[in-house]
Design a protein with these regions (language model features):
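Catalytic-core regions of core metabolic enzymes
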Residues: 1-712
Length: 712
């Protein structure tokens, strides 16, 4: 049986088909005086739109060379979509006219809505309510529109980069219309084609997540590129990203807001908060989204994936005509996390047979300057090089010629010989420029002739793109974690350390036993019953960081030490926090021996919902900030990945004589802590276990605290 979320997801995607594949369009507010109207109308001819275009103007007459209807209702025939280009105060009337004409898809260029404050947000809510009441799909407001290059449907209000690169396979979705244009322009200069470019603006209705879901099913799109300022429907975006990963469609995303300045700018631009950047970074890792920080890396990474696709063997062979470029490429490959293996002896022998006497068979392979005199050296050396069993992808560095004259000369011949060598090698291969450079129309023709995958990226951007493509392929091979059933709802609301540890124990998490005492005599009796050294900790609902104010004493043994410890801990806390309510003192057995203190904390992100952080625990949590984050629920396998991401991961495998911890036991404990937090419901603000003591024999929660929303 299909879930409700799946049904809603399909309905949302189906609703976009009528918009993005519209065959007739009304230009509402069309006028010769508007640069937006002029550009929108011209784009239909520029991109070869074969449908019908209907200018709509109150004054009627002729606009853009066509008779203008005075209203949408006056068009007199069915229309698939409308572009609203009217002033903000006229949007409601224009929308009502569009509805009356039965138009069920709208693109709203007009600004002055949620991005300008509370009053604008109210206007946007009213617009959305009107759209939903009539079943209208609404893109915008405050957006430039979209171009469906694959089906030649341009409802876009600025001039796109021309000429259009045919066969584009990258769908670009941006909350910023201008940035969508910048991405499209840079891609066009690099000879990289798009299938779609979509500006979502304020996202009153259609948001990035819905467009991603549409593109996952779009046959023309092989890679999806995103520019995000915020996320308006995190659950749907997560679901769409999972679908994309399963379908083998990489998502490459820029998400701004890592800095406070960028977050403020984004809020001013879209009227939305950007959310916690650490959580978004975790979402990318978890769902296989490739995160980049600039337009160049978005275009080059998406362009590589669109051309080369999934590479199963992620070991790289580097080839150049320059030894210096080979060395530079090797450095950047290592920085990108890409393995450049040694060649097998048979490969070296085969290369010696074709290289000049002064050449050295190696990876990276310097084919030497001899290729300037005899370009066939590439065609003869690339096949034995590519036959090496250790290689999965070949990257050859050579600038693409720019002019017809160059292409007719030796530079063009070198590229043709590289293409022949690529084809004969039987390996996936890409040619990269040495420095970032555009691709001319003549260069594109040569690439088509030679069937070469190419990036004008330069060494650093190109190898970064390869590293990201390899990482995505590895993530995809691990697959999408199977959906876990939600944990059984807990009918308790633990408050304080003792109750929280007891609750965790009931959910299958091993936790240290603690006893609440209210006198030195009770502390001594409890310690004697435990039969060994103990820990004393203050119990107070008002104190979170007990050790900061002398609220924790370790390794107390004997009646005198325990009694004195009780008095000291109470006195210390009363002196530091006289206003704090004290419930008493907790007595717990002291855990000695080798082990690593971990931290496991569940938080509720306002955009993404419950997430869990894992890191080195104890006093190191805030000092080192070495944590990995995932959305809940998590599997033990996902927690193992999180542990391996920590900067201090070496400590988990034993350090300077200490034994390695049982990572699987620790991962199981963390996954159960996550499930335990989910079971407590939405009123839980956070659940922290610190420390979670991990040893060679298991993991045990030594301290825990649940924080609740008082209004929940």
């Amino acid at each position: 049986m299909r879930t409700k979320a799946a049904v809603v997801q399909d309905a949302a995607a189906a609703g976009l088909d009528g918009l993005f594949r519209a065959r007739s369009v009304a230009l509402v507010g069309a006028t010769e005086r508007s640069i937006w109207s002029q550009a929108a109308f011209a784009n239909f001819e520029r991109l070869g739109f074969t449908g019908r275009v209907h200018p709509v103007s109150r004054k009627g007459g002729t606009v853009h060379g066509l008779p203008a209807a005075t209203s949408c209702a006056a068009i007199g025939e069915p229309v698939d979509a409308a572009l609203l280009m009217v002033p903000e105060q006229a949007v409601a009337e224009a929308f009502a006219d569009m509805n009356a004409a039965g138009i069920r898809n709208a693109v709203v260029l007009t600004s002055g809505f949620a991005e300008v404050g509370a009053e604008g947000a109210r206007r946007q809510e009213a617009l959305l309510a009107a759209a939903r009441s009539e079943g209208v799909t609404l893109l915008g407001p405050n957006c430039l529109g979209f171009i469906n290059y694959a089906d030649r449907v341009p409802i876009w209000t600025t001039q796109p980069p021309l000429p259009v690169i045919p066969g584009g396979a990258i769908g670009v979705v941006s909350q910023s219309g201008a940035t969508a244009g910048f991405i499209a322009a840079f891609a066009q200069r690099q000879g990289i084609g798009l299938s779609h470019q979509v500006s979502t603006g304020n996202e009153a209705d259609v948001n990035v997540a819905r467009v991603v879901d549409f593109l996952v099913d779009d046959p023309a799109t092989r890679v999806i590129g995103l520019f995000l300022e915020t996320v308006h429907d995190a659950p749907l975006l997560a679901a769409s990203a999972r679908r994309a990963l399963s379908a083998g469609k990489p998502i490459v995303a820029i998400k701004i807001g890592a800095s406070e300045t960028a977050a403020r700018a984004a809020e001013a631009h879209t009227g939305s908060l950007v959310g916690d950047d650490r959580v978004f970074e975790a979402v990318c890792r978890q769902l296989g989204v490739i995160r980049v920080s600039c337009i160049e890396d978005l275009v080059f990474t998406a362009g590589l994936l669109a051309q080369v696709g999934h590479v199963g063997d992620r070991r790289l062979g580097l080839v150049s005509i320059s030894g210096g470029v080979c060395e530079m490429a090797a450095d950047h490959a290592e920085a990108a996390g890409v393995a450049v293996p040694r060649l097998a002896e048979p490969t070296e022998a085969a290369l010696r047979a074709v290289l000049p006497a002064f050449g050295t068979p190696n990876n990276p392979l310097d084919v030497t300057g001899g290729a300037m005199l005899d370009a066939s050296l590439f065609a003869r050396s690339l096949p034995p090089f590519g036959a090496d069993p250790s290689l999965g992808l070949i990257a050859c560095f050579m600038d693409l010629p720019d002019t017809a004259e160059d292409i007719a000369g030796y530079r063009g011949e070198i590229v043709r010989q590289i293409g022949a060598g690529f084809r004969a090698s039987g390996r996936p291969a890409v040619m990269l420029s040495v420095m970032t450079r555009p691709v001319t129309e003549a260069g594109r023709a040569l690439l088509k002739e030679t069937e070469i995958a190419y990036l004008g990226s330069g060494v650093q951007h190109g190898l970064g793109a390869i590293g990201r493509a390899f990482a995505w392929a590895e993530r995809r091979e691990r697959g999408v974690p199977a959906a876990r059933p939600p944990p059984t709802t807990a009918m308790v609301r633990p408050a304080g350390e003792q109750a929280t540890l007891a609750y965790l124990t009931s959910r299958g998490v091993r936790a240290t036993p603690v006893t609440l005492v209210r006198s030195a005599a009770e502390a001594v009796a409890t310690a004697q019953a435990l039969g060994g050294p103990v820990v004393l900790k203050i119990a107070s609902p008002d104190i979170a960081h007990k050790s900061d104010i002398g609220g924790v004493l370790l390794d107390l043994e004997g009646a005198a030490a325990v009694a004195d410890g009780f008095d000291r801990i109470v006195a210390s806390v009363r002196a530091a926090r006289p206003e704090a309510a004290l419930d008493g003192v907790l007595v717990a057995p002291m855990r000695r021996g080798n082990g690593v203190e971990l931290f496991a904390g569940v938080l509720r992100d306002p955009l993404w919902g419950p997430a869990i952080a894992v890191g080195l625990g104890g006093i190191w949590v805030e000092a080192l900030r070495d944590t990995a984050i995932r959305l809940l629920p998590v599997t033990p396998g996902e927690v193992l990945e999180m542990l391996s991401e920590l900067r201090g991961a070496k400590l988990l495998d034993g350090y300077r004589g200490s034994p390695a911890i049982d990572r699987r036991a620790a991962a199981e404990a963390v996954a159960r802590i996550g499930d335990a937090a989910l079971a407590l419901g939405p009123a839980l603000v956070s659940l922290e276990v610190n420390p979670l003591r991990a040893t060679a024999t298991g993991a045990e929660a030594l301290d825990a605290l649940a924080v609740w929303d008082e209004e929940g």
